Amino acid sequence: MLTNKSAIKSTDEYKVLNTDSTTLTAEQQLALNFFRPSASYDKSSVKFIDLFAGLGGTRLGFEQACIEKGLNSECVFTSEIKDYAISVYKSNFADSDINGDITQIAPELIPDFDFLLAGFPCQPFSSAGKRNGFLDERGGLFFTILDILDAKKPKGFLLENVDGLASHNYGETLKIIISKLQDLDYQVAWNILDASEFGVPQKRKRIYIVGHKEHTPNLNEFTKTFKTVHEFIE
């Protein structure tokens, strides 16, 4: 999650998000790729689901991108299992009903939606862990996402993970992920982005994988914002 520092405020050990930031975060700019002029959307509501939702940073960026395009948005389904994350998420989005373990919910029970957001567990691909990939139960959660995309056939998705996913198993893991998504008739693009390039006071690289049924997202053109240490101290 590459959330801008000016869009968060502290709450105990964790963070609560707020929508006052005027700087476009990575999530916002990625989400804007969905909304091309040629695409048709019901302005009454762009529906999306938020899986492995964490504190809600990806949702925040998506909702702000909708606002930029003059679109209303509605989160119709949220899934998260960690109690502390659920507590903070509800502080950010008070009207949200949080569903538990997504592996225990049949795709047919998920409401119809236009876009899927998912920061699926990164430990199996992180350089800080054992990097067991799909052999790790958490790594296999990608296939849960795949099952949902196959069953619900939304217009697009935005997936986030650690940058180590790109090099895991000499790049073969990412190739499998891209291939499986393309098999579902999505046009897919990916890129590694650094939080420091979006006005955030830390170097934090993440891989973003974005897919759309109607066009190939452009993940190479971003408005990058760098801030000095002095600006952050102020």
Language-model regions, residue ranges each:
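Short glycine-/small-residue-rich Rossmann-like dinucleotide-binding loops
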Residues: P121
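The conserved SAM/SAH-binding core of class I Rossmann-like methyltransferase domains
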Residues: S79
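Conserved SAM/SAH-binding beta-strand->alpha-helix loop
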Residues: K82
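Conserved SAM-binding strand-loop segment of SAM-dependent methyltransferases
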Residues: A94-D101
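Hydrophobic "anchor" residues on beta-strands that sit immediately upstream
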Residues: V46, V76, D97, F115, ...
